[in-house]
Regions:
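Single-residue signature of alpha-solenoid repeat helices
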Residues: 19-20, 59
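Residue position in alpha-helical solenoids
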Residues: 30, 45, 68-69, 85
């Protein structure tokens, strides 16, 4: 949870995408086998950052990771956001 929260704060402070992504990746790695939403939300946020900077291949990779996860709080909403991002990139 620490890395996820840190990345969220850094994102709101408009810190470097590189730093934000690195912290989301740590949250993703540490949370993969835990049933909380931090790991899938981290994958989603990484995907959204990559979408925003037009790095669509990287975005799709992380959005697919997000969609492959299940059994966590807010799953439906997080998956809807990931699918919407993939739809935007396919247009």
């Amino acid at each position: 949870e620490y890395w996820y929260r840190l990345a969220r704060v850094e994102s709101r402070l408009n810190n470097s995408n590189k730093v934000i992504i690195a912290h989301y990746k740590k949250a993703l790695e540490e949370g993969r086998n835990i049933s909380s939403y931090y790991a899938p939300m981290s994958a989603l946020q990484i995907g959204l950052i990559y979408e925003k900077i037009d790095a669509f291949e990287h975005a799709e990779f992380y959005l697919d990771i997000c969609l492959a996860m299940s059994g966590f709080d807010y799953e439906r909403g997080i998956h809807q956001q990931a699918k919407a991002s993939l739809d935007r990139m396919s247009d």
